[in-house]
Amino acid sequence: MEKEVIAYLDNETIIDSQSVKNTNLKEIYFDNSKESLEVIRHSCAHLMAQAIKSLYPEAKFFVGPVIEDGFYYDFRVESKIGEEDLVKIEKKMKELAEAKIEISKYEITKSEALAKFQNDDLKQEVLLRIPDGAVSIYKQGEFEDLCRGPHAPNTKFLRFFKLTRVAGAYLGGDEKREMLTRIYGTAFADKESLKEYLTIIEEAKKRDHRKLGTELKLFTFDDEIGGGLPIWLSNGARLRSKLEHMLYKIHRLRGYEPVRGPELLKADAWKISGHYANYKENMYFTQIDEQEYGIKPMNCVGHIKIYQSDVRSYRDLPLKFFEYGVVHRHEKSGVLHGLFRVREFTQDDAHIFCMPSQIKEQVLEILAFVDNLMKLFDFSYEMEISTKPEKAIGDDEIWEIATKALKEALNEQGLKYGIDEGGGAFYGPKIDIKITDALKRKWQCGTVQVDFNLPSRFKLEYTDSDNEKKQPVMLHRAILGSFERFIGILTEHCAGEFPFFIAPTAVGIVPIGEAHIAYAKEIQKELLELNIDSEVYEKNESLSKKIRIAEKQKLPMILVLGDDEVVKRSVALRDRRAKEQKNLSLDEFIKLVKEKMSEVHF
């Protein structure tokens, strides 16, 4: 069957067929390519809006963009719409798709658009946010809406879609404005791809770290404490502690020095750094003795002050500081999401002060660090360089030097990378580390950032080999990004079945009766001396119930102890990952767990 053209590609810009005048452009076919899905999903957002308007004539619409894996639309409606209403909206969408309605585009001036939609306050909001000039409107049947496009030429291309959830969304993301209704959905070019995606979504629900965090007693949140402020329970704290200790050892082996800066700094320091002018809305401030202070959103200023605490020579460089730095950032309530988006979190943060000639060497060393750690947790990953944003400090030449150094390091390693134009932090370009989990979802975690600007702002110096004062380069570096986010991702990646070496409880010990508890506690103590946490299930319950409780906690290993095991000083082992049961002497078991702990290579 011949493929149908759904749009065209002009360099990196997708142009729908309604707008094409130059037929020499590259054709985008109706399939599951990135470009085609953008057109299909954008069009499906309008199809959904058309269906909603048909079912709820009073509905007014704000914006309906394409997002990763789908689309959404924000709108106002008098009726309360819940998950149960998605079925009838989908049914109406299918009717409209089967009607094969032509989708057309026309343009008017902004002033004409303001007049056309004068009785629609949400359209007025949209129009006030866009520049003067021509405004494009897409029309299908009786429905039309403001949109830049691109869109499919006909609703017949919109057959394989699914509305996934209903949520609330503040108008324009402003918590002080009204709450609109938001419906999310996704769409594909064929039934099989949609089915595969929905299967992944169902699996993701089972793996949701918020659900598993509760079931495995890792962490909790409390409204009296406040949103975005996780409380770590014993299991979660053990998991996190093991991760922290492992990373501490890796850092020390790689030449990093542990440091710790204050969490509260005078606003003067944030003014020098540029955070006050460029990042203030994301920070928390307070007054102490009529002096303004800011809680740190990043650790860099503290590390700069540690660098300045002594005279530095070229012989000292590179100087590597690392800290598990607790930071706070003001996040709107609507974007908070489990451990993925919080207001307080701990970064595995490091800053490397080096000479310009050492940049590439240090970036290469960081990339090796990243590779070792990601392989340890069975993550694949990719890199993306983020370049100078619109709001930035430092001149273009400095940015160019820094960006070039990052590209050269990645090229030397033969690593593929993308470019996120304008996605850098305000003080320097960066490499974003994006990991892929077991469900093939991509997550942005760590960063590597070259910074010439902060050393200049704080007048950092070192003495070179000619006894002259020079300015060092500063590399910002986080591998995990934050412990909270990484643990959330890891929990979903392994469905709560953590690797033995960081499992909060690695071994469940199940004594069959009271006579076997002493032996169970003896084993527990021996394991603890090896830094392996275990739990003895000593309640007066049936053996099957004890084992079931341990299995629900997804423990890597379960030991069952009865008369025979006590007499022979042995264990009946159930290995969850190997999916096997066997009897071992206690010495053999201890040797086995030592081997599992030694499998962690740095």
Swiss-Prot record:
Keyword Metal-binding set for record: yes
Keywords linked to the UniProt accession: Aminoacyl-tRNA synthetase, ATP-binding, Cytoplasm, Ligase, Metal-binding, Nucleotide-binding, Protein biosynthesis, RNA-binding, tRNA-binding, Zinc
Entry GO CC: cytosol
Record carries keyword Metal-binding: yes
Gene: thrS
Cofactor binding mode and count: Binds 1 zinc ion per subunit.
Biological process (GO), any one: threonyl-tRNA aminoacylation
Residues of the signal peptide: none
Lineage, uppermost ranks: Bacteria, Pseudomonadati, Campylobacterota, Epsilonproteobacteria, Campylobacterales
Family, per entry: Belongs to the class-II aminoacyl-tRNA synthetase family.
InterPro entries in alphabetical order: aa-tRNA-synt_IIb (IPR002314), aa-tRNA-synth_II (IPR006195), aa-tRNA-synth_II/BPL/LPL (IPR045864), Anticodon-bd (IPR004154), Anticodon-bd_dom_sf (IPR036621), Thr-tRNA-ligase_IIa (IPR002320), Thr/Ala-tRNA-synth_IIc_edit (IPR018163), ThrRS_anticodon (IPR047246)
Matches recorded under Pfam families: HGTP_anticodon, tRNA-synt_2b, tRNA_SAD
Species of the source: Campylobacter jejuni subsp. jejuni serotype O:23/36 (strain 81-176)
Known function: Catalyzes the attachment of threonine to tRNA(Thr) in a two-step reaction: L-threonine is first activated by ATP to form Thr-AMP and then transferred to the acceptor end of tRNA(Thr). Also edits incorrectly charged L-seryl-tRNA(Thr).
GO molecular function, one term: threonine-tRNA ligase activity
Transmembrane stretches, start-end: none
Entry superkingdom: Bacteria
Cofactor: Zn(2+)
Record EC number: 6.1.1.3
Quaternary structure annotation from Swiss-Prot or TrEMBL: Homodimer.
Record-given protein name: Threonine--tRNA ligase
Region (Catalytic): 208-499
UniProt subcellular location: Cytoplasm
Binding site for Zn(2+): C300, H351, H476
Record's catalysed reaction(s): tRNA(Thr) + L-threonine + ATP = L-threonyl-tRNA(Thr) + AMP + diphosphate + H(+)
